[in-house]
Amino acid sequence: KPGFMYHQIKEDKQLTYLLKKFNYSKYIYTNATYNHANVVLNNLHIDYLFSKIYSRDTIPSMKPDINSAISVEKNIRLNTNTSTNHEYYFFDDLLENLKTAKERNWITIWISPNFEDKYRYPYLDYAFPTIKIALIHLHKII
């Protein structure tokens, strides 16, 4: 099995534009390592758009463990110096992670080529085939 081809990850100006249109704090929440997420964001030239990376080596547990989501919420509240409830828009390709997110009352967005099957999963708020299409549609709503 060949290694991950980081050099093939290049800037996507449309993705950058779409992310910039959302004037909200953005976070990466991944089961990958911090270094993996950081290298990908840097290669895409979008690292500066994210406030923090939550990764397998920076939080106590991984998705879909509900304690993982709780620790991310607590850290965001701590870092934003607020106790008020935040609205979390959570994008993921794995249904089990989205199910846990819905248990935390997060707004769930499934990114999958099977997005048309959304109706089968009551814990999904939205479903799109790609992150860019999701951002285009969600910008009209939020």
Regions found by a protein language model. Give the residues of each.
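Short, acidic loop-to-helix structural element flanking the phosphoryl-transfer center
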Residues: P2-I28, Y34, N38, I66
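Asp-based, Mg2+/Mn2+-dependent phosphohydrolase catalytic module
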Residues: Y34, N38-I142
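Small/polar loops that bind or transfer phosphate-bearing groups
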Residues: I28-Y29, D92
